[in-house]
Amino acid sequence: STSRGLGDVYKRQVIKPLVKQPTAFAIITDNQTYANTKDAMHQYKTAVEDDGLATYLISGDWQNPDQVKQIIIKTYQECPSLEGLVLIGDVPVALVRNAQHMTTAFKMNEKAFPWDQSSVPTDRFYDDLNLKFEFIRQDSVNHQHFYYKLTEDSPQRLNPTFYSARIKYPEKKEGDKYAAIASYLKKAAAAKADKHNQLDRVFSFNGASYNSDCLIVWMDDEKAYMENFPLAFGRQMGFKHWNFRMKHPMKYKLFSELQRKDLDLFMFHEHGMPTGQLINDELACTDFNNRYKMLKSTLYNAVMSHVGKRDKDTLRIQMQEKRQVNEVFFKDLDNPKFWEADSLHYADERIVTEDLMKRNLSTNPKMIMFDACYNGSFHENDYIAGQYIFNDGQTLVAQGNTRNVLQDRWTIEMIGLLSHGVRAGQYNKLIVSLEGHLFGDPTFRFAPIEANTLSTDITIHKDDKAYWKNLLNSPYADVQSLAMRMLADADTQKELSPLLLKKYRESGFNTVRMEAIKLLSRYQDDNFIEALREGLNDTYEMVARQSAIYAGFVGDDSLLPAIVEALVEHNERLRVQMSANKALSLYPKEKVEKTIEDFYAKVDRLNENEEKKRLLRSLERMFVQEAKVHQTLMDVAAPEAKRISAIRNVRNYTFHFHVDDYLNVIRDAGNPQEVRVVMAEALGWFTNSVQRPHILEEIKKMQQTANLPEDLKAELEQTIKRLSL
């Protein structure tokens, strides 16, 4: 039956589910959006219920995010099988501070930069009820934005209670936003009638400068895709795998692909900004004319970038002398036709929201992934992901980030679950980050390869170990990975580590091996170290790369020979090389140099002495730089700002061998309070370090110190929570 609850201060209305189902879903919107899209909203609600989810429809005149959260908590208490929610229209946005360790890469100084830039817009405020937040203030310009701080005594890891998504119209698109939202909801409702569309048409594109343009990364992705999307392989044109090198400009070919009505999933692996996607970089110049054009554009732009600071003619003459060109070279400096052609050339290298609006482009892939920075910036008045769901095409779901994101993240983790009828939101919840969001209908799903009940069982059998053990030998890689994840989540006694190492060693599935290593990182035992040692030489580039990254995070000396071998023997893997190089910089200099000497004593390589010297020289530069930074960090006479900058560097470079020095900085009451607090925060990044137990023990002792400043006490508490397994 339908019931309405009215009469509270923000005119809340709750329409309860019309049907009983094993699990439930909530649609949350504001009263104005509801009033203007009522018919479409109810069509969507009915379609979701027909697809197996008991559905609540909740609207209100929300004054702040806490009011929305209260109704979510109330609904969850009433219905513990609530699995997900969608926020439609003008639902307040929480911008979170003091939680950068929950992002993949965002590390902006919250004290030095404006709040709207240094906070993270995130719906984890709504979907992760384990987290504790403290309200700070409403934004003075955008009244839909509210700042919160993650409290120090909150859990410090993401563990969402539900999945979530936003359906938020990009205001810059103009037009009637309510008509656009209604149109989208009708599209999403109508799509549910197709119960037979399997995930068998997939497109993957790698943009310029992504993952160092490494061709091994691009090639090895296909090893995973064959496991993720078995139906897309072995049939005509089921899978396309492009990268930017294939065409310049590539964007117009991509526009054609985006209009294919048979396409199920489109993955953009690229760099981005809120309103743009980087597709190509500068064209490689292979003939004289193109080289001349490139030189002309570069020097003309160099002159114009300084106009205003100095006179244009003076700048031109200086450039002629500096670059040894004559006056005729600059004859087009004031020619509008040159600048028009130049700007078109630059524009061809990017897809921007203006392109999509001007062309009124209909995008048709059912789901689109943007693993770039900022493409999911729904808090802005325009954002890439929003443009792809609000058009006349068939796109129902987009995945994007509100802040910058780590390139080396395993972006396609678990994506193959979509091949097995798992809902888009359920998949996204498994790979959660503070900045990562879904846009559109999170209940969307493809028809499974084989009939199953996975999408319900993820909620209903969450803690049923016997159920998940039974799926460990599924014929499908992603189902095995899901089973391992569910077992690890339920492993309160920390007993699963031997099984995960066994899985790593025995599985022929690349993605299962990668999931095993990721889960072993929770255990930080000998099995994890052993998996890393073998993983550095794994046939799947992503396993080798993540093993190199973890090897740096861990700092276990026994890994040094394997890191050096990966660095030298596999230099075609550019991201593995970069990660191994960084990892070596986090180990003591003498041990690294000895390992390199030992390695070269045993191998036969062309010009091995010269190669060894080059490697030692490049590492020496890193060690010298590190020693300088550490000296500044420890120097009580150095300016406070410089010391803090050196300490903040430790968040990215966890020098395990300096931990005792770092602890002394915190202990020393003679240090400025801010230096001690920032140092305590930096130690929270040693989550995988061999020094973690030692750090924990020492800072727990510090907590007992008399007259500890409140800020420092709070930071120590947060660091203890971050480092506790």
Predicted regions and their residues:
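Acidic, contiguous N-terminal accessory segments
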Residues: D8-D50, T55-G60
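Structural recognition of the beta-strand scaffold that forms the well-ordered cores
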Residues: A26-I28, T55-S59, G84-I88, R201-N206, ...
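Catalytic cores of nucleophile-dependent amide-cleaving enzymes
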Residues: S118-Y184, K293-W410
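Caspase-like cysteine protease fold
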Residues: T411-K494, N510-K518
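Amphipathic alpha-helical scaffolding segments comprising HEAT/armadillo-like alpha-solenoid repeats
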Residues: H461-N470, D491-Y504, D525-L536, D556-V568, ...
